[in-house]
């Protein structure tokens, strides 16, 4: 059986990257929440 996590840098960036987050309203909300919380890393 194949494991669920098959790492890929391209897929990681496309799905969870900064530009992917900024593309939708809810994604921008995630970025703002993480900024407000003071996260060192905002997204992948």
Curated annotation (Swiss-Prot):
Keywords: Ribonucleoprotein, Ribosomal protein. The keyword Ribonucleoprotein applies. One of its GO terms (cellular component) is ribosome. Pfam families: Ribosomal_L34. GO terms for molecular function: structural constituent of ribosome. InterPro entries: Ribosomal_bL34, Ribosomal_bL34_CS. Transmembrane segments: none annotated. Gene3D superfamilies: 1.10.287.3980. Coiled coil: none annotated. One of its GO terms (biological process) is translation. Belongs to the bacterial ribosomal protein bL34 family. This is Large ribosomal subunit protein bL34. It comes from Neorickettsia sennetsu (strain ATCC VR-367 / Miyayama) (Ehrlichia sennetsu).
């Amino acid at each position: 059986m194949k494991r669920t996590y098959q790492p890929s840098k391209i897929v990681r960036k496309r799905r969870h990257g900064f530009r992917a987050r900024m593309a939708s309203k809810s994604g921008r909300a995630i970025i703002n929440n993480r900024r407000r919380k003071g996260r060192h890393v905002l997204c992948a």
